[in-house]
């Protein structure tokens, strides 16, 4: 396997340990299950529909987003470096009858023989877990067709995001295991757009996501000061 240096073994091990709870709707990945309908809707609406399109989910983990995209008719490949999460994803896909190809590989290595192959590439909640986000973004750009879309989501780096995602979500509300995130690895929108601008991708849209702990509901917001997604498109 080539180009596998952009991997943090501690990050992989962290998600390996949590893999068995990936599909527990009230477990450690409950926030991802609550957030996923917003992610899916944003991807489907922005692209004009992913039915029948080839989609790659980079950093797919246990397959929450991958399965939801496959259920609405996308041809999905899921990519991750964690063997345990991938096994969970494969088993769950078998149980639910969803057809997804899961591959253990890095984005960089997978891109070597998938140049311009996908209509849509998603990279959600993944960039803050790798040593070199720029390398992943370039690989995602390489793998999407001209005119295709690449979606990224991550967390802004500021005092509010530290309070909400680490002090709040990990320590106070216990929504996530302590140590899930490292605030120093969060990425400001301006930084992410600069990384995108170094490729053939153009940022087309950005949207924030906010969580109400009283209602337990995620919703879109124009503010990108904590969780946010961007939609990019490859230049023809």
From Swiss-Prot:
One of its GO terms (biological process) is methylation. Its EC number is 2.1.1.222, 2.1.1.64. Keywords: Methyltransferase, S-adenosyl-L-methionine, Transferase, Ubiquinone biosynthesis. Pathway: Cofactor biosynthesis; ubiquinone biosynthesis. InterPro entries: SAM-dependent_MTases_sf, UbiG_MeTrfase. Gene3D superfamilies: Vaccinia Virus protein VP39. S-adenosyl-L-methionine binds at residues 39, 59, 80, 124. One of its GO terms (molecular function) is 3-demethylubiquinol 3-O-methyltransferase activity. It catalyses: a 3-demethylubiquinol + S-adenosyl-L-methionine = a ubiquinol + S-adenosyl-L-homocysteine + H(+); a 3-(all-trans-polyprenyl)benzene-1,2-diol + S-adenosyl-L-methionine = a 2-methoxy-6-(all-trans-polyprenyl)phenol + S-adenosyl-L-homocysteine + H(+). It comes from the Bacteria. It holds the Pfam family Methyltransf_23. The keyword S-adenosyl-L-methionine applies. O-methyltransferase that catalyzes the 2 O-methylation steps in the ubiquinone biosynthetic pathway. NCBIfam families: UbiG (TIGR01983). Belongs to the methyltransferase superfamily. UbiG/COQ3 family. This is Ubiquinone biosynthesis O-methyltransferase. The lineage of its organism: Bacteria, Pseudomonadati, Pseudomonadota, Gammaproteobacteria, Alteromonadales. The gene is ubiG.
């Amino acid at each position: 396997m080539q180009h596998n240096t952009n991997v943090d073994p501690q990050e992989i091990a962290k998600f390996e340990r949590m893999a068995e709870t990936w599909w527990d709707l009230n477990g450690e990945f409950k926030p991802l299950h609550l957030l996923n309908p917003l992610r899916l809707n944003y991807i489907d609406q922005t692209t004009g529909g992913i039915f029948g399109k080839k989609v790659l989910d980079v950093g797919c983990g246990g397959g929450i987003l991958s399965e939801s995209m496959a259920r609405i008719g996308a041809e999905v490949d899921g990519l991750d470096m964690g063997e345990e999460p991938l096994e969970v994803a494969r088993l769950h896909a078998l149980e639910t009858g969803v057809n997804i190809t899961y591959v253990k590989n890095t984005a960089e290595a997978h891109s070597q023989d998938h140049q311009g192959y996908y209509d849509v590439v998603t990279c959600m909640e993944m960039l803050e877990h790798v040593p070199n986000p720029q390398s992943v973004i370039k690989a995602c750009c390489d793998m999407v067709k001209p005119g295709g879309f690449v979606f990224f989501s991550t967390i802004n780096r500021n005092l509010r995001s530290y309070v909400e995602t680490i002090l709040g979500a990990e320590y106070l509300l216990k929504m996530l295991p302590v140590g899930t995130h490292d605030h120093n690895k969060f990425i400001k929108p301006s930084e992410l757009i600069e990384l995108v601008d170094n490729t053939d991708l153009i940022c087309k849209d950005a949207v924030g996501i906010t969580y109400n702990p009283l209602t337990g509901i995620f919703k879109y917001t124009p503010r990108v000061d904590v969780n946010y997604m961007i939609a990019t498109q490859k230049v023809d």
